[in-house]
């Protein structure tokens, strides 16, 4: 690690349709092989479907879905005296968003629906209703942290 200075986070340009940095990050996570316009088309189509189902505007519905997947605690491995402990630590806000988005995209890719836009829309709808694979993933992470609460004093 460099000792001189801390390098700041890169600024992400907000997405052209809604002007949201969060949505731009989501598009970047979904993007494969640098095909951003394809990723944008998929996300916008999914958000349109989500908005029709939920009755809210696209950005609001996306925020609700993302909020239900964001983890508050996770476990990190810590080696102490020859044995490894899973130590629960709080998740930083930037990482919360990144994990939530990654989990939603992974869950959508594993679904068996026809198009990616439909898979993503279904996963976001499930996330907004507090069900689905991405929400289950968050619950599993929280359960792991709760189970290993005894090792919280090993935090660094």
From Swiss-Prot:
The keyword Ribonucleoprotein applies. PROSITE patterns: RIBOSOMAL_S7. The keyword tRNA-binding applies. One of its GO terms (molecular function) is rRNA binding. One of its GO terms (cellular component) is small ribosomal subunit. One of the primary rRNA binding proteins, it binds directly to 16S rRNA where it nucleates assembly of the head domain of the 30S subunit. Is located at the subunit interface close to the decoding center, probably blocks exit of the E-site tRNA. This is Small ribosomal subunit protein uS7. It comes from Klebsiella pneumoniae (strain 342).
């Amino acid at each position: 690690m460099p000792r001189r200075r801390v390098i700041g986070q890169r600024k992400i340009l907000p997405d052209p349709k809604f002007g949201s940095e969060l949505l731009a990050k989501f598009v970047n996570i979904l993007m494969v092989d640098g095909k951003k316009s394809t990723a944008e088309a998929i996300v916008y189509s999914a958000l349109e479907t989500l908005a029709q189902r939920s009755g809210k505007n696209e950005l609001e519905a996306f925020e609700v879905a993302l909020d239900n997947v964001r983890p508050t605690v996770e476990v990190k491995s810590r080696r102490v005296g020859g044995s490894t402990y899973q130590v629960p630590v709080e998740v930083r806000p930037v990482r919360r968003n990144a994990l939530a988005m990654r989990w939603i995209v992974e869950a959508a890719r594993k679904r068996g629906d026809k198009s990616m836009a439909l898979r993503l829309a279904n996963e976001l709808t499930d996330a907004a209703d507090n069900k689905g694979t991405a929400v289950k993933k968050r619950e599993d992470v929280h359960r792991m942290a709760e189970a290993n609460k005894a090792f919280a004093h090993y935090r660094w």
